[in-house]
């Protein structure tokens, strides 16, 4: 069978209508290509569009110059979203001003760090956290308490949780951390915590502390960095380990949508200057949240780190142990000089007193 010709355009006419014969085939292919493109576009929608968004519209308590004259609540609670809470310990109770993070899943909840104060009368961490947990049946959902690392200001609240029902406190030493989370190849593997429809990734990041870990929440895109990365002094105990951790964390971040980077302290003012060690008053603080762009500057800062103290952009890196050792040596040198000067002066005076006058 031959198709009739369009005498004017010299093209064959299909029986489906006055269109060139190739029209219907090309239209079908176009529609298929369009559907494939739409499917690929939907699949390629950034994960950030699927994240649960929260609010950081909060003004953190700045402490006080005179805490006795200005008593304040020991804990400030901010609801980031319905199942995520940020708690800050008041600077007047502890100059560390720790941030704690409560993440609630369908089956259990996770508390990241429990702060710098063990006395529940001064800092009622356990009571505050339990009051935020939802009730399932006749009791509140189980709670798991973990630590970004083992420094005391991140685990001194452990005793408040130790004897509570439906509460488990994770270990903080290196051996305990590796076994509890089930890392297959520390520090080059990850672990996961399933809270029920909410999975938390656990990323090893030794350097500040040998058992330091970060937590990434797949629900909100929040990355909790503890003392590894924060708006303040980055205390580096092991530079080589910290460099390797920074590289691993950045590679991890490139595969995830990170909405905010949240550390454990604020030690900078809004101009990027550090508050004095031990200060109970932080007026005009830097924001708690950092970005992945901030995080991406860490490798260069670590490469520039001289092992003692380095300022790199807004980052202040220091090895606290070495700085304390240098200060101790300087103090010893100064004390030695003072003692030597006093003894020398005393000997001069003694020689003058005992000198025999010469008769001419």
Language-model segment annotations:
Residues 81-86, 190, 199-201:
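Short, hydrophobic/aromatic-rich segments at coil-to-beta transitions
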């Amino acid at each position: 069978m031959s198709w009739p010709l369009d005498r004017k355009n010299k093209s064959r006419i299909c029986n489906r209508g006055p269109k060139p014969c190739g029209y219907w085939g090309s239209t079908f292919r176009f529609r298929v290509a369009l559907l494939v493109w739409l499917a690929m576009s939907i699949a390629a929608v950034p994960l950030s569009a699927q994240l649960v968004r929260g609010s950081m519209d909060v003004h953190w308590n700045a402490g006080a110059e005179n805490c006795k004259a200005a008593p304040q609540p020991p804990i400030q609670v901010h609801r980031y979203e319905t199942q995520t809470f940020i708690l800050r310990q008041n600077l007047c109770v502890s100059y560390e001003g720790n941030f704690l993070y409560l993440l609630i899943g369908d089956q259990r909840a996770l508390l990241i760090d429990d702060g710098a104060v063990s006395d529940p009368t001064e800092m009622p961490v356990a009571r505050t956290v339990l009051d935020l947990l939802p009730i399932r049946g006749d009791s509140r959902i189980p709670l798991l308490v973990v630590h970004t690392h083992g420094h005391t200001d991140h685990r001194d609240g452990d005793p408040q949780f130790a004897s509570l029902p439906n509460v488990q406190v994770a270990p903080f030493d290196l051996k305990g951390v590796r076994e509890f989370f089930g890392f297959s190849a520390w520090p080059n593997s990850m672990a996961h915590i399933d809270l029920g429809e909410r999975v938390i990734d656990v990323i090893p990041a030794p350097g500040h502390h040998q058992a330091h870990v970060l937590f990434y929440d797949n629900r909100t895109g929040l990355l909790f960095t503890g003392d590894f990365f924060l708006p303040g002094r980055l205390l580096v105990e092991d530079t080589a380990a910290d460099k390797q951790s920074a590289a691993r964390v950045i590679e991890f971040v490139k595969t995830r949508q990170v909405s905010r980077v949240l550390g454990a302290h604020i030690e900078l003012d809004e101009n990027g200057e550090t508050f004095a060690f031990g200060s109970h008053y932080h007026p005009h603080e830097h924001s708690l949240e950092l970005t992945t762009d901030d995080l991406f500057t860490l490798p260069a800062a670590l490469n520039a780190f001289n092992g003692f103290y380095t300022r790199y952009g807004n980052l202040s890196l220091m090895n606290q142990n070495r700085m304390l050792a240098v200060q101790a040596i300087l103090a010893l040198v100064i004390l030695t000089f003072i003692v030597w000067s006093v003894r020398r002066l005393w000997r001069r005076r003694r020689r003058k007193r005992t000198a025999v006058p010469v008769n001419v």
